[in-house]
From Swiss-Prot:
The gene is tig. Residues 509-528 have a biased composition (Polar residues). It is found in: Cytoplasm. This is Trigger factor. Residues 163-252 form the PPIase FKBP-type domain. Residues 434-447, 475-484 have a biased composition (Low complexity).
Amino acid sequence: MKVTTEKKPRSILELTVELDKQQIEKALDRAARRMSQKYNIPGFRKGKAPRFIVENYFGREALLEEASDDLIQKAFQDALKQEGIEPYAQAHLTDVNLTEAPYRFTVEVPVAPTVVLPDYRAIHVPLEIEEVTDETVNHAMEIRRDRHVVLRALDEPRPAQPGDQLTVQIETFVDGEPLNPRAEGEDIPQSTLVLDPERIVPGLYEALVGVSPNTMVDVTVRMSDDHENERVRGRDVRFVVNVLDVQERLLPEWDELPALENFEGTLDELREKTRNELIEAARKNAEDDVFVEYVRQVIAATTFDLPDALIVREADSILREREAEFERYGISAEQIYAAQGKKRDDLIEELKPVAEERAKRGLVLREIAKAEGLAPDESEIAREVEDIVASMEEERRDSARTLLETELRPFVVAGIVDRKLRRRILAIATGDPSFEQAASPEAASEPESADGGEAQTVDTHIDSAPVDDVSTKQAASPEAASEPESADGGEAQTVDTHINSAPVDDVSTETPIVSQEENGESVENQSVVDVATPEARTE
């Protein structure tokens, strides 16, 4: 058997296998025996007709057809072993000739992606930390205070005053057309607005001051030239607002704030704590910006050759994540697809560009981790396990330790590599070796932002990469253990090395609509224009 290979784009290896006549004849013998056992041949009991009788009765072409599948599959497996080829996904038969010499067939075999990093250590990104001013601290303190507001119904109806909270129904129009059309008979959803010039776009705010409940406000506002929504940028937008209710917002006195925040200290000490949190958050945001920009530049300078199967797998992983989000809200994926008038395969196809970018990012991070030798040693893994179990109830520690040291060991390794990789990239990008100083898992946890919400984080995990010796999935709790995941974020799976003549299936979905609050619950925003000011959105 002679095997030749040719490298083709998209990580495809074209494998041509040439068979000798002896292999063909043996395969025909086996096929004849099978056919004589399956079919009635006049003058012979089943399984007793010799090959030449079977061939004369059914024809050589039928015999070849019976023989070809087993012959090709066996020869293909032998060729893979002979050449040391590990398929990344199912192979595809593209050409077959078993009727005359030379007997051969051609298979396209997806192989692991090729990633050639640039001189990534020559890429640098400055660390630019935003200054925390007194004004910034004042704003954060106002947010703290605002969290403890009490809403009170008005004793007597009166016009809305600055600081009040309005319950409204809003419709928005551009050029006379609604920005988000509703189905016939569908009610306009209710939402709430705080009557504050820093929270509502100019023009609309002024129109709402002084309105009474059960009043309609119809106002046209020129949106800013730099508005984040390009559909309304620099254009006139008509707002039709039905004011349903006006409530008074009662803010606590400043000296009550420490107790309300469960803070043991004075107001000045709470203010200082807030400043420190803002400084820490500003540094964290700057580090995130460096990380994102550095990885972007490395990706742009990296040479990739990715198999289509990797992109499809990544797209499927993204779609599974979104389906899980729908399920959490009691909505089945089938309901979403039906509403969109799309099939799952259509969505996967749409997701491919996003999936390819995510795959590239994961592969680049994986290759940097490998090049930098960030795989942890046994002592690091042991320390990580002990740090994790130390936070658990004592009676659960022994079982958790056993699980972390066995089934969940890859996740433990992943958490270590994630942190080391982030610090190494920041050190390379900024030229500041202090980022390499060891940090405990507790120190690596994300700080709470000064406004009380969780600090925004940048995902530094290595996803979208084929299974490798450097895994960087985030460490999971023992309770989260179930089926192992592959390093590309999907379920672990074995590669079918059989040949398939059909192409690999391909999948995408759109980002969910921006939501706003309706009676305290998140709902789909009926307007694509955000009535909030940029400052309010940062809260």
